Amino acid sequence: MMPRRFAAFAMCATLITSCTRVQTAGPGGRHQWTQPHILRVADISEPDHFNPLLSTMDLVYFLDSLVFSFLIIADDHGKLIGDLATEVPTLRNGGISNDGRTYTYHLRRDVRWHDGAPFTAADVKFTWQAVINPNNNTLHREGYDRIARIDTPDKYTVVLHLKRRYPPLVTRFFTPLQEGVKGILPAHLLAGLHDINQIPFNSHPIGTGPFKFSSWERGRRIVLLRNDYYYKGRPKLNEIIFNVIPDDNSVLNAVRVHDIDLVTTPPPVLYEQYKALPDVSVSLAPWNAQNILILNQRRPQLHDLAVRKAISMAIDYNSIISKIEHGVGTIPHDIVPEQSIGYTNNPSYRYDPAAARAVLDHAGWRPAPDGIRQKAGQRLDFVIHASAGSANGRLIATFLQPALRAVGMNLDIKMYPYNVIFSHEGPLYTFKYDLADYSLTLPYDPDNLFYYGCDYWFPKGENIYGICDAAFDRLEKAGLQTDDPAQRAKLYHQAEREFHNSVGIIPLYNLRRPVAHNPDLRNFSTAPASAPWWNAWQWDI
């Protein structure tokens, strides 16, 4: 899981197929090791539970997208399409009112829960109430808390009344598009409970998705069975088995001996080894996520734009991608994904240490005898914080040390356990850091005010960077005053350019999702979403 915060997103991946050797075919032309219509998946982690309202684990997002359903999803090209809703609400189709405060969702009439009960508007209303219920340990209420009330005039109509206009709502209300994936829960089973934090449902879920929960042998495997009554059609797979394998190298070996058909989380360091496996197809799926270097602008030195610019020019981004990401990452140009209406193809930050030194010279930062620059009694002496559980985090921090030293800055490294560095009492959320490196998901909608706005410093929002850019704020706020995509796009293009030029954060690389699979797997593609498995009912093997 990544903070945010982490939308994982991918267009249908182009396969990069490794060398193959001739094998005796099994039934239907399959390889001998393929089990017809049974997909074996592996991951090094195990879910904490299955409740889509309570977890922030990427694996839970994946599993829940098979068991539960959403109102709106994205296809493999990033286009929004209806799932439980028959269409995406827009101004043009009347789903969004002219004042932007009323949203109407029309629901499918052919959906049943795995226990046979009908799915209705009451389920949507109940799940929203569960999200905003303070007794539930729900994270990421952003968007849901903008709703004043929900009406259900009939079983298949849901009407949202917002407290005020909020254009990102469609991309955040029961969608799998970004961090905080939330599927719809069954009201007939859960309504009336004080909370849903510790209930049997969380380990034996009932959903409306293409596969239904069968069993969970903790520490070993999870079995999902085909939902014969799935509303989009009978799934082609009979069974999906999730195998819990404790480490990445063991997963690689399981793929090598063909005990596993699909791995969607192999680390970049093993990417070349996966590509070298015979009879295994390997792809790189674009993913709406970034690794970023954040700068605490509450520190006087980092509040200086010249210092932030110099840091951005001291970094060799291509070397990070080739040496640390093993070619899996790509150069970033914006802090929103390419599918977003606000995406702006900014020039990438350039690697130019000489220019970085010149910028600092011009701003009055002069080298001391030890080579570290100083000005008015302040030194460019920093500490970078990273997660002790992230191999890439340590590698990046180590990579940055000589890079910053070359332009007159000192950088020490401090590693924290994952649950400490991202705790609300940890160094990031208490602004007790200089620099930090981590990965996050990019929001599908270009609205970033909650993360970078002047009024949203934590705990009022998720601005843990000390950023306050008046021009950026003005443009972001204007983008929330209209639901017209064309008008919003113009405003967010300006906002993205302003943020880029002010070096609010430094994106180091865009992530891509390595995927390794049995070449007998058919119709598999990933979507630009935190829960990327948008068409699992069509998969077959």
Predicted regions and their residues:
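N-terminal lobe/hinge region of extracytoplasmic solute-binding protein
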Residues: 42-97, 129, 206-208
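Detector for C-terminal structural segments
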Residues: 217, 221, 291, 314-347, ...
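Extracellular/periplasmic solute-recognition and catalytic clefts
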Residues: 22, 131, 149-150, 214-225, ...
